Amino acid sequence: MRVFVSSRRVKRWQFFHLFAICFILSFMVFWGPINNYIMSHMKSYSYRYLINSYDFVNDSLSLKHSSVQPHHPYLINHREKCQAQDVLLLLFIKTAPENYERRSAIRKTWGNENYVQSQLNANIKILFALGTPHPLKGKELQKRLIWEDQVYHDIIQQDFTDSFHNLTFKFLLQFGWANTFCPHARFLMTADDDIFIHMPNLIEYLQGLEQVGVRDFWIGHVHRGGPPVRDKSSKYYVPYEMYKWPAYPDYTAGAAYVVSNDVAAKIYEASQTLNSSMYIDDVFMGLCANKVGVVPQDHVFFSGEGKIPYHPCIYEKMITSHGHSQDLQDLWVEATDPKVKDISKGFFGQIYCRLIKIVLLCRLTYRNSYPCRAAFA
């Protein structure tokens, strides 16, 4: 009997020993990248004050007097889009030539100008900004883009290849177009084509800001003290030759952000003086803003690169959510249902929604959507 018990204890210890070894090995394998990630962010954040407060970053990226930004002629344009109109919001949607289905879904939902005019009593202008199809995709796609624009009249296109590494050219397209053809729009917004925008909430928010005449306004999901990615295998790799500093100036996630028209004008002017080889467009925006002294403000209901949890209590105050390439129309119907506002009515409704938001938003896992403090906003 003692031998049997002793044997069980030995097997148990062997199991725990094996488990401990596996745990340690797993920890060693995964801790390296995690530790590097944590340390790089801690290091970059420690430089944040210097990066945001002094001009040495901008000086190192400024164009020489003999240099100019590359010029890309328009292939599709609508210079009359804003003429002689009182425009609350000029909204650019960054899209790829092949993403017709996404553009179509946006036109049927939150990007419908007629809906915003008739139901929300606001005049907004929406344009899809893009470059040219990759040469391997041939001329047929360009022909389809021309046909699409003849139907909807909402595309602007310049003559540069539409690719990830040309996103800053697309940034220059948007702010250049706004500066030339629609400088009087109260606000400028830029968004990805897989974003969801709760247009009723956004319009209500902007109309309130318009009444108080807000200036120096730049809002979105703010990244503070983010480090450049030095891993060559990463999509976001930035070599030292392109950007040598350990941290970026504060910037908003490129998924969606809004600026007032005075900021849009300043950003355009700054963009003409900085080297556009920095192909991460939201970082380039941060560099431009840093040069003219504009500071981003964080809004808890602007999503980062993450998708928000689906629930009516979340929809009540949401403004943007990222990553909706397939479910845009269903989410539009659910989120804009008038019954959503009824859920949080009354004392018990407010308590219920507060608890739901805490459960959905206050998690240890990083979601890059709404922060925990949004549950208490």
Swiss-Prot record:
Family matches, as PANTHER family: BETA-1,3-N-ACETYLGLUCOSAMINYLTRANSFERASE, LACTOSYLCERAMIDE 1,3-N-ACETYL-BETA-D-GLUCOSAMINYLTRANSFERASE
Q: Identify one Pfam family in the record.
A: Galactosyl_T
Membrane topology (Lumenal) = 36-377
| Spans within the Cytoplasmic topological domain | 1-14
| Entry keyword annotation includes Membrane | yes
Annotated membrane topology: Single-pass type II membrane protein
Protein name, UniProt field:
Lactosylceramide 1,3-N-acetyl-beta-D-glucosaminyltransferase
* Superkingdom classification of source: Eukaryota
TM spans, by residue? 15-35
Quick one: which pathway? Protein modification; protein glycosylation
| EC code | 2.4.1.206
Reaction catalysis annotation: a beta-D-Gal-(1->4)-beta-D-Glc-(1<->1)-Cer(d18:1(4E)) + UDP-N-acetyl-alpha-D-glucosamine = a beta-D-GlcNAc-(1->3)-beta-D-Gal-(1->4)-beta-D-Glc-(1<->1)-Cer(d18:1(4E)) + UDP + H(+); a neolactoside nLc4Cer(d18:1(4E)) + UDP-N-acetyl-alpha-D-glucosamine = a neolactoside IV(3)-beta-GlcNAc-nLc4Cer(d18:1(4E)) + UDP + H(+)
User: Which Gene Ontology biological process is one annotated for this entry?
Assistant: protein O-linked glycosylation
What's the source species' lineage?
Eukaryota, Metazoa, Chordata, Craniata, Vertebrata
Q: Which InterPro entries match?
A: Glyco_trans_31
Where is this gene product found? Golgi apparatus membrane
Q: What does this protein do?
A: Beta-1,3-N-acetylglucosaminyltransferase that plays a key role in the synthesis of lacto- or neolacto-series carbohydrate chains on glycolipids, notably by participating in biosynthesis of HNK-1 and Lewis X carbohydrate structures. Has strong activity toward lactosylceramide (LacCer) and neolactotetraosylceramide (nLc(4)Cer; paragloboside), resulting in the synthesis of Lc(3)Cer and neolactopentaosylceramide (nLc(5)Cer), respectively. Probably plays a central role in regulating neolacto-series glycolipid synthesis during embryonic development.
Q: What is its main location?
A: Golgi
Q: Which residues are glycosylated?
A: N58
Assigned protein family: Belongs to the glycosyltransferase 31 family.
Q: Does the keyword Transmembrane helix apply?
A: yes
Gene Ontology MF, one? lactosylceramide 1,3-N-acetyl-beta-D-glucosaminyltransferase activity
User: Which UniProt keywords are present, listed alphabetically?
Assistant: Developmental protein, Glycoprotein, Glycosyltransferase, Golgi apparatus, Lipid metabolism, Membrane, Signal-anchor, Transferase, Transmembrane, Transmembrane helix
Q: Name one GO cellular component term.
A: Golgi membrane
